[in-house]
C-alpha cells in the first residue's frame, strides 16, 4: 500500500505508519461485518479508506479511486506469504488444493498468478459465485459440491478464525488455523494452530 500512498503524496499529510495504524483495524472490522452480510463489498471498499483518511486528517478527494489503485497494485506484486509455495507443493502431493475466498472476484485469480502459486490450485471458489460469504455453512457445502469432496476428507487452512475456522468447523471440516497475527483466543476449535505455514507440512 505504501506505493499508492506515496504516489498520491499523502505522506505529506500523515506519516504512512500512522495511517496504517488507523487503516488496519478499520479494514478488519469492515471485513468482519462483510463476512456476516452486514455490509456490501461496495460499502467496504468505499468506507475503509474514507474512514481512515478522515481519522488521520487526510484530504483525499476520491477514496474509492484510491481503493481501486491499491487493489490494482496488489495484483502486480510478486509476493506470497512465507512458506506458501513450499506448503502448496507438499499439499498437491496429497490431493487437489482449492481456494475458498470471500475476496474480490476480479482480483483473486490474478493475485494467485502474480504470486506464482496458481499452478498449485485446482479450483477457485468465490463467495460471489452464490452470493453467500464465509462463515455461512452454505458456502462450505457449495464448495464441496463443486469439487466432489466430503467434510471428513477436507481440511480448511485459514488465517481468519471467524470466517475460515469457525465456518469450516460448523460444516464438519477439519481445520488448521494459520494464526499469523498471534491472535489470543478464549477458545479454539481448530485441529491445529500454527504461526508458520511450513509447520503444517509435518502435520499433514
Where do the protein language model's features map onto the residues?
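Catalytic-core regions built around general acid/base machinery
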Residues: 83-94
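Short, well-ordered coil loops that connect the C-terminus of an alpha-helix to the N-terminus
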Residues: 10, 58, 93, 149-150
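A short alpha-helix capping/helix-coil boundary motif
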Residues: 26-30, 64-68, 86-88, 119-121, ...
Amino acid at each position: 500500500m505504501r506505493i499508492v500512498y506515496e504516489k498520491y503524496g499523502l505522506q505529506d499529510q500523515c506519516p504512512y505508519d500512522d495511517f496504517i495504524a488507523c487503516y488496519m483495524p478499520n479494514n478488519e472490522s469492515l471485513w468482519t461485518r462483510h463476512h456476516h452480510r452486514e455490509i456490501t463489498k461496495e460499502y467496504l471498499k468505499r468506507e475503509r479508506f474514507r474512514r481512515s483518511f478522515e481519522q488521520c486528517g487526510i484530504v483525499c478527494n476520491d477514496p474509492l479511486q484510491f481503493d481501486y489503485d491499491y487493489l490494482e497494485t496488489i495484483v502486480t506484486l510478486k509476493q506470497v506469504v512465507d512458506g506458501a509455495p513450499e506448503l502448496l507443493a507438499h499439499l498437491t502431493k496429497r490431493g487437489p488444493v482449492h481456494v475458498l475466498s470471500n475476496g474480490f472476484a476480479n482480483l483473486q485469480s490474478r493475485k494467485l498468478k502474480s504470486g506464482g502459486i496458481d499452478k498449485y490450485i485446482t479450483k477457485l471458489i468465490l463467495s460471489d459465485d452464490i452470493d453467500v460469504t464465509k462463515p455461512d455453512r452454505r458456502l462450505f457445502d457449495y464448495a464441496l459440491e463443486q469439487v466432489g469432496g466430503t467434510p471428513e476428507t477436507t481440511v480448511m487452512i485459514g488465517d481468519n478464525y471467524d470466517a475460515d475456522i469457525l465456518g469450516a468447523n460448523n460444516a464438519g471440516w477439519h481445520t488448521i488455523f494459520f494464526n499469523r497475527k498471534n491472535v489470543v483466543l478464549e477458545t479454539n476449535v481448530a485441529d491445529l494452530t500454527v504461526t508458520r505455514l511450513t509447520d503444517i507440512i509435518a502435520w499433514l
